[in-house]
């Protein structure tokens, strides 16, 4: 039976796994985690993995799909946080693989969505999905991922998007104040959507509220917020957004307000993008916040702004929203795409 090779390539860690095509969904055979920085390139890592895992699994993979943290153009990808330049044809030759495809690590989720089971998802909003219509996946994590899926005779086709880097459009005086504060605090000429609508954005919203209401640093989150800001994007940066979510769950007023503002901005952006591509095939929410903030996504704080699109509210009302709660969805989706490559 054919084997599939799937990889989720990130700046910190890389997951490589072997799968069997299976029936309705690929079946995991084995998986190994690697520290990306320990390797000069992806090819030697893959060769090492196949030399050890291949004999155990029963052969050489017939197809491989690697989800990479960065844009992919013409079968080539330059990773955002690694000095690697990947080429699908070169990887195929170097690793002895018949078929290799590189896909952006968020766009690849499109290929996994039709095969997710109930344990990998959670309903956010009930609705009626049109299987012939486009679908949309958004993921608020460190940044904001956006991708569309178009139904074709050969299955879904993933369309990457950089919509998260559009301009953040304030809807209220509070959001306007937040945007101006971020411009000054981050020394930026413009504020993109993902500066607010992302896990990182939740941290920024909390910092803004702390600056406005507790300038003397007397709030329990003041210290963590200062350390988080000073750490920049370093690997030892504490998780301020998680601390804000925990404080909100404990009914801290400032943290609850930060989460409410963030959910409203997220819901509004989801509604805007759902209208942009008329995603009657459904809206899927992935990323690190989907499972952690499920109650918030089901609340009026998120769903009210999602639907608040004037005359187009009726277009969004039937649209189902589903959260992807499986942390391993990246490699699973890459395996689904590798199976598609076999035709």
Task: Report the location of each language-model feature.
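Residues on a specific face of well-ordered alpha-helices
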Residues: 44, 89, 108, 142-146, ...
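Short, acidic Gly/Pro/Ser/Thr-rich loop/turn segments
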Residues: 14, 71-73, 143-147, 204, ...
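Short, electropositive alpha-helical surface patch
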Residues: 117-128, 203, 338-343
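ATP-binding/phosphotransfer module of carbohydrate and carboxylate kinases, centering on a glycine-rich
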Residues: 1-58, 180-343
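Active-site nucleophile and cofactor-binding loops and adjacent substrate-binding regions
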Residues: 34-36, 79-83, 101-108, 126-130, ...
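Short glycine-aspartate micro-motif
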Residues: 4-8, 61-65, 101, 135-139, ...
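Glycine-rich phosphate-binding loop of actin/hexokinase-like ATP-binding domains
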Residues: 123-126, 131-195, 199, 294, ...
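Short beta-strand-loop/turn "lid" adjacent to the catalytic site in phosphate-handling enzymes
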Residues: 54-102, 107-122, 137, 291-295
């Amino acid at each position: 039976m054919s084997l599939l090779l799937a990889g989720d390539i990130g700046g910190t860690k890389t997951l490589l796994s072997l799968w069997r095509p299976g029936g309705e969904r690929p079946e995991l055979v084995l998986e190994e985690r690697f520290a990306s920085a320990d390797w000069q390139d992806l090819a030697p890592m893959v060769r090492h993995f196949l030399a050890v895992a291949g004999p155990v699994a029963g052969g050489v993979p017939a197809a491989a799909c690697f989800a990479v943290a960065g844009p992919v153009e013409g079968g080539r990808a330059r990773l955002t946080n690694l000095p690697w330049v990947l080429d699908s044809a070169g990887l195929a030759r170097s690793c002895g693989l018949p078929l290799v495809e590189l896909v952006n690590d968020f766009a690849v989720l499109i290929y996994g969505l039709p095969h997710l089971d109930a344990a990998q998802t959670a309903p956010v909003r009930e609705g009626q999905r049109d299987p012939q219509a486009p679908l949309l996946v958004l993921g608020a994590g460190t940044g904001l991922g956006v991708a569309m899926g178009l139904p074709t005779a050969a299955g879904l086709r993933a369309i990457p998007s950089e919509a998260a880097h559009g301009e953040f459009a304030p809807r209220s005086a509070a959001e306007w104040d937040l945007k101006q504060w971020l411009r000054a605090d981050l020394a930026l000429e413009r504020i993109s959507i993902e500066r607010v609508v992302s896990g990182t954005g939740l941290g920024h919203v909390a910092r803004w509220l702390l600056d406005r209401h507790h300038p003397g640093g007397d709030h329990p989150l003041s210290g963590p917020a200062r350390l988080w800001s000073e750490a920049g994007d370093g690997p030892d940066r504490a998780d301020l957004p998680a601390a804000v979510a925990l404080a909100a769950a404990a009914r801290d007023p400032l943290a609850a307000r930060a989460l409410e503002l963030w959910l409203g901005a997220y819901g509004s952006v989801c509604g805007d993008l759902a209208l942009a591509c008329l995603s009657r095939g459904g809206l899927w929410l992935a990323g690190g916040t989907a499972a952690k903030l499920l109650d918030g996504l089901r609340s009026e704080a998120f769903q009210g702004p999602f639907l608040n699109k004037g005359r187009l509210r009726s277009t969004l009302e039937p649209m189902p929203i589903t959260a992807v709660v499986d942390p391993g969805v990246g490699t699973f989706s890459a395996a689904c795409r590798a199976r598609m490559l076999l035709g």
